Curated annotation (Swiss-Prot):
Protein name: Uncharacterized lipoprotein RF_0128
Keywords in alphabetical order: Cell membrane, Coiled coil, Lipoprotein, Membrane, Palmitate, Signal
GO cellular component entries: plasma membrane
Coiled coil: 56-101
Subcellular compartments: Cell membrane
Lipidation (N-palmitoyl cysteine): C17
Covalent lipidation (S-diacylglycerol cysteine), chain numbering: C17
Annotated segments matching region Disordered: 101-127
Residues of the signal peptide: 1-16
Topology relative to the membrane: Lipid-anchor
């Protein structure tokens, strides 16, 4: 299980390093070398940290991930059971929500609770 986690993190970090290594001044090779070293250090640090996790915690995390996969499968099945019109509406609604989240700037009177609630509402309305 830890190997899967490390492999997944390595892929994500590699992709992000690849995207960041394309610089405008043409020093792609230098940036890639630097990012590879950074990536390897992060992977090594995570491996050391993951080795300190208790087996019962690992099992709990694994069970959690299995449950999340089941929930996501049920969400897809429920979405697919909707009419095309309902699916189209939800897709359009999501586009508008994305436009709002991009254009919305944080204000001084926004509390952390309001932000958390808006994230929860967004998650429940998506596929």
């Amino acid at each position: 299980m830890i190997k899967k986690i490390i492999f997944g993190i390595a892929i994500l970090l590699s992709l992000s390093c690849f995207a960041n290594s394309t610089t405008s001044d043409g020093s792609k090779k230098d940036a890639a070398k630097t990012n590879d070293g950074t990536t390897q250090k992060i992977i090594d640090d995570f491996s050391a940290y993951a080795g300190t996790i208790k087996p019962e915690v690992r099992k709990e995390i694994q069970e959690y991930r299995v449950e999340i996969v089941d929930i996501n499968k049920k969400k897809r099945e429920l979405y697919n059971s909707l009419s095309k019109e309902a699916q189209n509406f939800l897709a359009e609604q999501q586009k508008y929500k994305q436009k709002l989240s991009i254009s919305k700037l944080p204000t001084e009177d926004d509390s952390p609770n309001n932000t958390a609630n808006s994230k929860d509402n967004k998650d429940t309305d998506t596929k």
